[in-house]
A protein has these predicted regions:
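Short beta-alpha connecting loops at secondary-structure transitions
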Residues: 7-9, 75-76, 134-140
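Generic long, charged, amphipathic alpha-helical segments
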Residues: 121-147
Length: 169
């Protein structure tokens, strides 16, 4: 299983956080379904455990408090350390984060993802903002823009992380 995050993203066989998070959740749910229909859930639970351990060992950047976007499979096997918002919200939505990781990952969005102030006549003056999907340069359509579904899914991630006030803004 994988996702379509953008028509401008290409990962060359690497370890990708959002895809791995989806695969973790899929295996976790397959274990629940297997148990309900009388099948053995063990292979799915074991696979989910392996995926979660790999996510934390290979892609969690403890010094930065978020997951890497991906680790390249070839060459120097470098980590792409500037995650897009889809990496954060898919990880939280797929329940791969512990509470502290969830807090740290949303703090990454607070501090590293561009925020565009929202102001309007009649709107109370607060720190309302919308966000870009990444902090990547040079600008490329579809990987560094404001997409309402991405903004809403990121807001949901804040609620899932226990930070509803920040998610509302």
């Amino acid at each position: 299983a994988c996702i379509w995050a953008s028509d401008a993203l290409y990962y060359n066989s690497g370890a990708v956080t959002h895809s791995s998070a989806y695969n973790y959740r899929a295996n976790k749910m397959a274990a629940v379904i297997a148990e309900k229909i009388g099948e053995d859930p063990t292979p799915y639970r074991e696979e989910a455990g392996k995926i979660l351990r790999a996510l934390n060992a290979r892609l969690w950047l403890s010094d930065r408090g978020h997951w890497a976007e991906y680790q390249d499979y070839m060459g120097h096997r470098r980590l792409h350390e500037s995650a897009g918002v889809w990496t954060i919200y898919h990880a939280l939505d797929s329940e791969v984060a512990d509470p502290f990781q969830a807090y740290q990952a949303t703090r990454y969005v607070d501090t590293e993802i561009p925020h565009i102030p929202v102001r309007a006549n009649g709107l109370e003056e607060k720190d309302y903002a919308t966000i870009a999907t990444t902090n990547w340069l040079p600008y490329s359509w579809s990987v560094n823009n404001v997409a309402f579904a991405e903004v809403m899914h990121t807001a949901l991630a804040y609620f899932q992380a226990g930070r509803p006030e920040a998610g509302y803004k």
